[in-house]
Structure formats: C-alpha cells, structure tokens
C-alpha cells in the first residue's frame, strides 16, 4: 500500500466549508481514481481563534502502478478547479507520501561526484511532430533528409530516432545534433544541405518542430561505452511566476536522480533555448533533461517505480501537491540509442 497524506492549513471557521467541498467535489472522483480515504485528523484538535489549524487527510492506493494511474487522471479541468477552490480557503497545503519505516528497505544514494562531467561543443535537440495522415513514403523522405545532417559542416554527431511512445512526447522523432561550436551550427543552417534538403523536409512533413539549443546545468557519465540502449529526452517548462530559488531546488532534485536511481547511466540537464528552426504554438520550454539507460526495462521498471521519482520528483509536476512549479504538460520521449551522445560531448574535470 502507498499512503498519501494531505496537510491543509486554514482558519478553523472555514473547516465546514472545506469538508463539504471535499465530500461533494473530490472524494467520489478520488475513489474512482483508486484513492481510499483512511482517516481525517485535526491538529491541534480544537478550533483556535487566532491561529490556523491543520487538517490531515490520509489516503491509500494499492501500489505504484495504481499510484501512476491515479496521477494520470489528475490533470483534468475538474481537478484543477477543485484545488483552486481549496486554495481560496487555505493558507497553504502540501501532499506527502509517508510510508512505514519498519517496512522500508532504505538504500543509501550513490556518490556520483566521480561521474560528473562538463560538456563541450554545441548541441541541439528537437522533437519532430509528423503531419496527420503522413504516408510511409513521406516518413522515409523525411528520415532520408534528416540523415543528411551528417554532411553538415562542423557537425560531429547526428541521431535520428523514432520515439517508442509518441503519445507522451511533443513529437514522433527525436533529432539530435552535436556541433563543434555554436558558430558552426549557425553556418550549417546556411549550408546547401540544410536549406535545400533538411529545412524543406521539416516544413513539408512536420506540423511542429520543438528545436532547442542546450546550455548544460549538470551532466554525468557512468557508462561511456554505452550502445544499443535507450535515451529519454524530456522537455519541461516552469510555471509562470516561479522564482529562481524554486527553480534551482527543482534542478538540484533532478540532478539527484542518478544518485538515487543507478539505472540512469548517463545524464544531462540543460536550459533550453528555442532555435531559429523551432516551430510551435506552445509556450517555450525551460529545460531539456536527458537520461541514457541500458534497456527499456530499466526505464519502465526501476526508474518509474523508484520512490525518489514518484514520491519526491513528481510533486514538482503535480497540481495536487501544493508545491507544483512545473507545467504538467511535459514532453516525455524515449527512443533507441545506438551510441551515447553524452559520451561524445563529455569532458572530464581536472
């Protein structure tokens, strides 16, 4: 069982209104999402006149799979509207995931300092969304054009990979380019290969191109010889009004993931900057978070089920957590990786 603990701080005179709101607009739908209400407690156990009180709601879901199912159903307008009403009544709220310490197998985080690297050159990554109804022949034409990126001046590495579950991503393909410098990338976009082959193919066959330049925040390399693997490319955007302190806390939490989850072999967190060939009506992305895994099982198994992921990191994305700072509309792309891109750009520190 997984325990979910909501703590809501509010004036005692608003408790009846809040309880009625939960019973009428949240609890029935929560039960349909697999959440069972176990108990409701108040601390201190009396209505204070001059101070707020804390209302504690304890829920349970059966397991991690049920938890992810519950989270997948949280991003509805009805859930968002409910929590807006709650926020109007409360001074603060936060969701926690306390578990029975006696039943936990606590595993110390790994020290990843020896694996940390800097990056060189200039890398660009893009999510390519195909036009609806595109034919197999047109997909092949697009891939052929993208593969010609290997002929661009100054390019050092090119990867064109089909996303395995594009419904979770901003595109059907992940397109990566490594140049020796930003100046080389700019020159490449003026070259004949780009202007006469790649750019026209993108315009013709893609309804959106989420193309980002990457400015490294932190990177690490556990498996330099990694090949025949899986690359996860995630795009995130901070919510409007998120201050720098909260952004840095989010970044630090992401960069702790490899220490907690050893299946993340190589990683790179970068600030995102839209490129001249970016084409999308969506709000700009803030981050690119790349992870390289030995296998798809490592991504879908230990990575998704690790408590550091679902009980800690996910709260930054969850509108029910009370601490959300990242838009839940993220891009989660994962695709085959022939060889490590992070290895190609890594520079070991002195």
Where are these regions (language model features)?
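Short S/T/G/P-rich N-terminal loop/turn motif that feeds into the first structured element of a domain
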Residues: 1-80, 84-196, 200-311, 326-350
């Amino acid at each position: 069982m997984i325990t979910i603990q909501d703590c809501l701080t509010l004036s005692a005179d608003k408790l009846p209104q809040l309880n009625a709101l939960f019973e009428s607009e949240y609890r029935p739908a929560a039960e349909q999402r697999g959440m069972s209400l176990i108990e409701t407690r108040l601390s201190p156990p009396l209505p204070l006149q001059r101070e707020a009180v804390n209302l504690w709601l304890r829920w349970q879901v059966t397991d991690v799979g049920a938890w992810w199912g519950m989270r997948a159903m949280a991003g509805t307008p009805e859930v968002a509207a409910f929590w807006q009403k709650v926020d109007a009544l409360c001074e603060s709220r936060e969701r926690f995931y306390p578990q029975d310490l006696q039943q936990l197998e606590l595993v110390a985080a790994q020290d990843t300092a020896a694996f940390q690297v800097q990056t060189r050159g200039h890398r660009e990554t893009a999510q390519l969304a195909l036009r609806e109804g595109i034919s197999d022949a047109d997909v092949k034409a697009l891939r052929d054009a993208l593969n010609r990126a290997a002929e661009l001046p100054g390019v050092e590495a090119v990867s064109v990979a089909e996303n395995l579950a594009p419904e979770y991503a901003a595109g059907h393909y992940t397109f990566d380019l490594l140049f020796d410098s930003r100046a080389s990338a700019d020159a490449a976009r003026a070259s004949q290969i780009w202007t006469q082959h790649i750019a026209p193919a993108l315009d013709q066959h893609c309804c959106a191109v989420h193309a980002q330049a990457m400015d490294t925040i932190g990177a690490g390399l556990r498996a330099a010889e990694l090949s025949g693997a899986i690359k996860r490319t995630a795009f995130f955007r901070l919510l409007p009004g998120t201050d720098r302190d909260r952004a840095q806390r989010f970044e630090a939490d992401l960069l702790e993931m490899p220490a907690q989850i050893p299946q993340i072999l190589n990683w790179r967190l970068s600030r995102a900057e839209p490129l001249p060939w970016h084409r999308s009506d969506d709000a700009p992305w803030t981050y690119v978070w790349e992870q390289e895994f030995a296998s798809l099982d490592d991504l879908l198994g230990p990575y998704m089920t690790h408590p550091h992921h679902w009980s800690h990191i996910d709260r930054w994305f969850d509108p029910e957590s009370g601490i959300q700072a990242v838009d839940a509309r993220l891009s989660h792309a994962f695709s085959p990786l022939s060889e490590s891109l992070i290895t190609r750009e890594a520079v070991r520190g002195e």
